Amino acid sequence: MSLTVYMNHGQIDMRHALLSHAHEALNQDNNLTVYYIVPNHVKFDSEVDVLRRFARLTGQNPDTSLYAQSRLQVYSLSRLTWALLKDMATMQPNVIQGTGLFIMVSDILRDYAAQLPIFARMQSKAGFVTTLVAQLVELRASRISPEDLLTILNQESDDDTFLRQTLSGKLRDLAIVADALDKKMGHTYITQQEVLSFFATQLATTQLKNVAFYFDGFNGFTSPETQVMIELMARYPVTVALLGDVEKLGSQQPGDLFYKPMTTAQRLAQFTKIANQQVVWQVPTQARCLDESIISVMSAWEKLGEYRQFNSENKKTNLAAFVAENTMVEIQEVARRIRQLLVAQPDLRLRDILILARDLTPYTGHIPEVMQQFDLPYFLDTDQKMTNHPLVELLLNLLRPAKERFQYQQVMAILKTGLLRPYTDGSLVPEGDFFDIVSYLDNYLYANQPFERTWRDLDHPFTLFTVSEDEDDEDARVVLDDKTVNRRIETLRRFVIDAFDSLQQQLNQAQTMRQAATLIILWLEKYHVTEAILSQRDTLLAAGELSRSREGEEVWEMMTQTLDDIVAIDGDERFELEKFKAILVAGFEGATFSGIPNNLDQLTISEAGIVQSNDYQYLFFIGGTRNNLPAQLKSRALINDAERLIVQPALQENSTPKYLQNTAQQQMAEENLLFYGALTAATKNIVLSYPALDAGGQISDMSPFFKRLVDAFNITVNKVTATPATSQALLKYYVGSVRSTLGELVKIAASQQQTSAYQALRNTINQSEPERLERVLSAPNYKNQTETLKPELVQALFGETLNMSISQLESYYNNPLAYFLQYGLALKERLTNRLNVAQTGTLYHAVFEGVVQQLIIQQLSLRDISQKALQQLVADNMAEITAQPAYQMLQETGKMRATQHYLAKVSEILAVNMQRAARVNHAQPKAVERLFGFPNRQSLPALVVSTPQATVHLRGKIDRLDSQDPSQVYGTIIDYKSNGKHFDWGQAYDGRQMQLLTYWQAAQLSAEQLGIEAIGGAFFAKIAPEKLTIKDFKGDVRAMLRGEIKPEQFKYRGLFISEPAYIDSLETLAEGEGSQFYQLKKKANGELYANSDVISPEDFELLLKRNLDNIQRASAAILSGDFPLSPAEGSLQFTPFTDVLRFDRALGDQYKNNTPKNKSDILKLLKADEE
């Protein structure tokens, strides 16, 4: 028996040497079976390549005839273990998965808590148990026993540093847990990482006949793999191919390029000699079929990777490098170059091209979009975690505490998986129909946020409704939607309740973990979750998504495996929901999908840390920045890097040396070898690239690995920009697929669009996709401007007669296009019934309406009743209104009931404020919520305004009308507002504030019907308190905390006529005195100050005329279909249509011209208009 080591550099065809040796051995011994071992990740590709090559060695042509071989079998080490163990006498213990270990270790931490001072504190940290499990697995795989740990602990040392003290405590706890875990596992279980160790023990007691082992593609071996190698080398012929230089064996130093494989070779030779077996060193010479440039690059890195000088007589190479603006531009440029390669070389296949990165994370979000844009099928050869799969989402949300299950986020997360669907007429509800009604239920739940109590109140069906916040009607009105939709929502509601209750019943019945696992599986089957998984699989298969189609089954298998572990290990333990869920989480977090390519010919995108085949023709190495290459590794193991430097020497002093995994620093020292392995993957050409700006927008420098090669060959690093500088540059460098090229064509400046290069590309694209070309090329000329609607469309949307509220006209002047969206197309933002500012204002509004209405019935005013009676009246109305469905959220929780109590107290304060204001005059309320322009008998006539196009009927609702004096000569209009609104002269002139003036005009037309002679004033009344953040509060904080802060001063703000009798009816003031409740103050001579809310009758007539003109202009514009994007400044802050409007001043959009706000300036404009 012997160990044969083939060693040379990456340019040499090691596989040819191994296969030639195997062929010779097979010819010499007809009974011999050769096991050819390759890394697991490249097993399939390697098997195909090995058999094709071996066929040629036997004189056959695999390209023209089928070839099979039973005496040479290609395996990964794990598959070889399985293949040989199944025929051995000793039964392999059960392999425990990570979830089983998680269960055992969790139990140990609970049972031994008093003996684990360090771990008891660390256990509260998220992920600690998982980290501890990983450390225990590493120890077991390396055959490091609790006794080994205690030996290290008991060694005398002069090191009294904090690090040593911490390590001692950690090792003591680790030894206790490891010992307890050994007892729990016994001979029944082994970890997945111990399977090779078990295989090694069986090899020591089992004699295989007529076998030889060949190892290809390895740079080193883990501790369990080394154990297998030791047993094989002691008994059978073993041949290994490793990178290195035989002549330098024994003189290699850490940091040398081939330090790891050469050290591995030495260790293997040492073990072989200990077994009294022969070691043969071979230096193969047959070169791989490589392009000269690849040979030059590999030769260069063999020196540069060790910081040695490289001098090449021939520095001409096909090595290329570029720097892109950012990661998106970089991956686009790579895709573009691949497209160009495919066109230039018709025989080239996508499977011959490899894209590598040291870390693909910055690119994973861009890859799907870019590859679709360039029409390149690809296989992303990285681990895809299971944690985001719908089945995982379903399970983890279902296993939340019962009180959380009916929350909006949880319900929608469960339903949107598509795995919990109603089952009718012998089949699941189709996905399309199901998600349609789920979207309606989503809207309802989002709007109402019902708690579990509301869910279960089946006497009150879930009815889709909207809350209107129109300025002319602030009442929340419930509007029934389509009856069919409501019925389907209610059906889905009952299905959800039934499913959740059934699950909770199962969980309540479960006394042990075994029962819980069983009942959950039964529940999933009862609600046809398995059928839903298969349905999703079939849909994905039909769409050609072969890889994704298996994901559901893989997650199900992972779940059942985890449940099996729970039953086997903790089956008789008392069921605890949180522990049960934590075990499932641990299982899913460590699980990944098995990647299966969708196509035979597709691009491979992978990471440099993953073993790759070395028969790709082209390599694109992306992301080569200083921060990514070499990788900046950090150890997350329980025994950290600093502690490993203490532990490792002690372990190697044993008679049988044992090894922990390398520290992060040791792994980083191997980055030069990892990069060399990436370079060996290509046979023709290599392209290096990196982004100037990383994914976070930070400036990136070139990787030192890249820089050494670039400098050695004097390579020009081309700069790739997101936009071609000229049309010639576009034609030369930016041509890819039709779609991608069109995306670049549209970026060309107008000055370059008449060049022959631009026209040639345009004509070429026009032949295949003329419509897309026209649409895309017109995009830069797009102006964010509206077009005038056709008359027939205007009539269809608005009718021949405009029936509208004054707030709608105001919204037109604020933002014409938003008016069209809201009132023409009837667009609405997503329904919500949260208690926002508008909702609270609506509530206050309704309360005061009810209070004043009762006073009118009793022919009283606010001043005629006591404060206590008023407060009781407010409380009664508040209770009545909050009992309505629109305010049901105020009854849902203790917090919301406290909010209701707060609103009631605020209402009382506001009512008392209005009562104090009422005591300064003799005003008497005559009407509340008085409608005009509505089609009912109680409504006052509409305000009718004629335009050349049509007649406009204006409607509205006067919140309150007071008779201001005992003679009932003057009336006063009161309009409640949630904010402290004042009369804005500039907005009134522009048509953005017409409400008071229009209500004034409408009421004046119906003065006789209202029982007054004339309207003397119209005012806004603020009915919601101002909210301040604590940082804006300027008063006494201690008084605020004691609840002693006085409420803000209540004041009516608006407009009134300068008639002395009316002014005196508001409040009788002496000369020099000011009103507390009105913006009204007299000078010493009896005249009013200019800042009073007063206007002369003459000026008021001009203002009313301007108001009518505004109504006519807006109406005419609406009926003419004129809805320009011309918002008033500040109006976009409150519109829900910003995504539709896409207003951007940087692109030329303009606000309306500002009008002066000063009263005197507006009066000058009015008089000028009149002249």
Swiss-Prot record:
Which InterPro entries does UniProt cross-reference here?
A: ADDB_N (IPR049035), DNA_helicase_suRexB (IPR014141), P-loop_NTPase (IPR027417), PDDEXK-like_dom_sf (IPR011604), PDDEXK_AddAB-type (IPR038726)
UniProt enzyme class: hydrolase
Pfam families cross-referenced by the UniProt entry: ADDB_N, PDDEXK_1
Q: Which UniProt keywords apply?
A: ATP-binding, DNA damage, DNA repair, DNA-binding, Exonuclease, Helicase, Hydrolase, Nuclease, Nucleotide-binding
Q: What else is known?
A: Despite having helicase-like domains, this subunit does not have helicase activity.
Q: Which family does it belong to?
A: Belongs to the helicase family. AddB/RexB type 2 subfamily.
**PANTHER family for this protein:** RECBCD ENZYME SUBUNIT RECC
Protein name (Swiss-Prot/TrEMBL): ATP-dependent helicase/deoxyribonuclease subunit B
